[in-house]
Amino acid sequence: MISFAEKLSFLMHITETSNKELAAELSVDPSMVSLMRTGKRRLSKKPIQVRKMALFFAKRSPAAFQRQALSEMLGQVSISPSMPTEVLASSLENWLQGKSDTIADTILSGIQALPDLPQPAPIRPTPAPASENQTLFFYGEEGRREVMSRMMQEMQQMETPGTILTVVDDNLEWLLSDYLLTKKIQSGFLELSERGFTVYQIMPTLNYINRYAESLQFWLPIYATGQIKVYYYPRLRGNLYRHSIIVVPGCCVQYTCAVATGSTSDITMFSTDPQLVSAFEKQFQEHIALCRPSLNAHQDPRDFLPCFLELFSRQGDTIQAVNSLSINSMPRELLEQLVRDAGTSDWAAGYKIHLEELPHFEERLRHAPYIDMCWLSSAAEVRSGTVPVVAFSKEYSGFLCYTPKTYCLHLKNILRLMEQYENYFFLPLDKKERPGYNLFVNEGDLALIVRTVEPFILLEIRQTAMITALQEHLLKKADAVGYDGIHREKVRMKLRSLIQELGG
């Protein structure tokens, strides 16, 4: 792992920056920069200082050779001369802070950043549609880019929304290395989703693709529209050749094949031949029949309930991190109150089902561990009447917030579960900054990520490797807090203290 001192020296070298110049930018003495370069001084904990440093180096790295060096050092193929300075500064900021670029981090940071993602208005294509019965061949990365642009033109010119069938079996380096084209294609897919196009995609598992995190950053905003259904082939396969397919039934097809070790051998076909398009469509249907669901997105909160019921009914280890006390640990009397207050709303049926499932949940605790990480509210927050019940915002819950009495009821039930079941672990999280998501993981089977600010989105993840990555992310957080032995008793003491402060 590269130290901060080594990172700083590298950046100062490729930008030909002196200690005095960087010190002037940061408003510190040059000796401070010297200490940081020798490892005797750590990176400032002040976010504004790190941001200023990252932006300073990004502005001084416009040349192609500098961007290439940064791309190799940071392991991000998307760092190219066309990448805006502000975007490069953000990547440098994360790198300097030592933030990892794991699959879990990519998904969780991406789901929070969705509204902030730049979505430039797509430029409407002007070229005429391709001639029918036309089959053309293109070569190398430039050929792939040209065909991708042609495919996007054909799809955007369709008057009626249709279906797009895709097999993505490569690492997208040919696309990600061109920042402007990447944003144009991403924007095009977002526009097609808004128009009502449905996309079916077959993706490889994590261990069959390089740059998976960067590829995921490209696709995640498109997944979040809910218009794309993602599948994966679960069996082992050869890894010599890579190929990708885009089929627009009744319109056109793109097919690319290359040796996996490089991109210089890429051969890409573009065709509007009806027979060829139909043949590739049939081949895709045969392929997807052998695949399993990988990821789905839901935007309507009413569609969330079936996913949660499936998660809570599964056996095996479960771990979750949520921004409120969880519904699983809620006492019966509070759930009954929720049912009454919900009346005939869409929430009533869900609360009734959870009420009926309480005995099954406790029976499950006899057989498998359940780690319940929740952000605790302070006594002052509870007394203010602004802490929603089983929700991440008042807008989402719509009708009920905790009182000191009901919050104490919930805390007392958590204590009861801890006393009665050794497999139930409650970890109070009290950091001031809560993430913009709730995360639930059942070992090896299902993971749910709920975006907790508008627009509300639920990602339903079923690919084993992705689930494992998210589970390891939560277990690392749980291990850092501590949840067994002496830590268990400390949690009890913390809960009793809060109950006493609330007058319970």
Predicted segments, located by residue:
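Recognition helix of helix-turn-helix/homeodomain-like DNA-binding domains
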Residues: 27-44, 72
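A short, Lys/Arg-rich alpha-helix, primarily the initiator
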Residues: 1-17
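The alpha-helix within a helix-turn-helix
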Residues: 12, 23, 54
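DNA major-groove recognition helix of helix-turn-helix
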Residues: 12, 37, 57
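DNA major-groove recognition helix of helix-turn-helix/homeodomain DNA-binding modules
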Residues: 47-64
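Short alpha-helical "recognition helix" segments of helix-turn-helix
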Residues: 18-24
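Hydrophobic protein-protein interaction segments
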Residues: 129-501
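Helix-turn-helix/homeodomain-like alpha-helical modules used for DNA recognition
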Residues: 62-138, 149-153
